[in-house]
Each structure stands twice: as structure tokens, then as C-alpha cells.
Amino acid sequence: MSTNKINKKSIARIAAVQALYQNILQNNYDMYDIMQNILACYHSNSIDLPKNFKISLSISHFKMLVKSVFENINKLDEIIDNHLTNDKDPVHMPILLRALLRVSICELLFCSTTPAKVVINEYTDIANDLLNEHEIGFVNSILDKIAQENNKIS
């Protein structure tokens, strides 16, 4: 029997988006508690998966992403808001989309030795699983634009 595995950093990215989403939903509930709850969930394998499917996350990558987002949250929100088109209202941005953008932009700009194209592809894949079609294109577009503006890709 083969065991399906997903890259530990990919799982850490998903978990970081979950943590930020939960933080927004719970009105800025203590981030440390949210991180501990999410880590406990992943460690206890309480996520409903097929028997031959294993997931584990890079704890260090998860913690680094979440902490970096909180250290840079005002700057991240400013970057997001500055990249919205006139028809997009930052106040009405879906919570999950904002959480995903905060984490992805943070990794892209502040805390990654991973090539920008890999980061963009990873978060576009995550968006594909979590968001609607229009939002997926928006995530890909905004990350690509931010990477180009910051000389992360040519």
C-alpha cells in the first residue's frame, strides 16, 4: 500500500492561512492559542483523511509564517489595499481571501528563500482549493505583480 504525502511546507502554508482566517473570524483572538490549536489538530491526525493519506507540517515554517504576518500585518494590509482595483472594496474583501493574501505576500516579501515562482504557484494551488474562480485569478495576479515590483521575478 502506498502512502500519499504532501510537502510539509505546503501543509504549513495551508495551516498558516487557517490560523489567520481563524484569527480574523474570532476578532483577533490570541494568536498563540490559535497556533497551538491548529498544531494540535494536525498532530492528533483529527483531520478526516483516507487511511493511506498522511499529512504533517513543518512546524518551524508554520510558526515563522504566522509570526511574520503579525510582525508585518499593517504593511501587508497596506500592500493588499494598494493593489485593489477601483471595483474592490478592502472593507468587503472576503476573510479567507485576505488571510491567504496576508500569508502569501508575507512569505513572498519578508521570509522566504524559496523562489518567487514557487511561492506564487503554491498559494495559487491553495487558492484553487479554497476560493472561487475569480478570486484564484486575483491571487495569482496580485502575487505576480508584487513579485515583479519587488524584483523577485523578471
Swiss-Prot record:
GO terms for molecular function: RNA binding. GO terms for cellular component: cytosol. Transmembrane segments: none annotated. The keyword Transcription regulation applies. GO terms for biological process: DNA-templated transcription termination; transcription antitermination. It comes from the Bacteria. The keyword Isomerase does not apply. It holds the Pfam family NusB. Keywords: RNA-binding, Transcription, Transcription antitermination, Transcription regulation. PANTHER family: ANTITERMINATION NUSB DOMAIN-CONTAINING PROTEIN, N UTILIZATION SUBSTANCE PROTEIN B-RELATED. NCBIfam families: nusB. Involved in transcription antitermination. Required for transcription of ribosomal RNA (rRNA) genes. Binds specifically to the boxA antiterminator sequence of the ribosomal RNA (rrn) operons. Belongs to the NusB family. This is Transcription antitermination protein NusB. The lineage of its organism: Bacteria, Pseudomonadati, Pseudomonadota, Alphaproteobacteria, Rickettsiales.
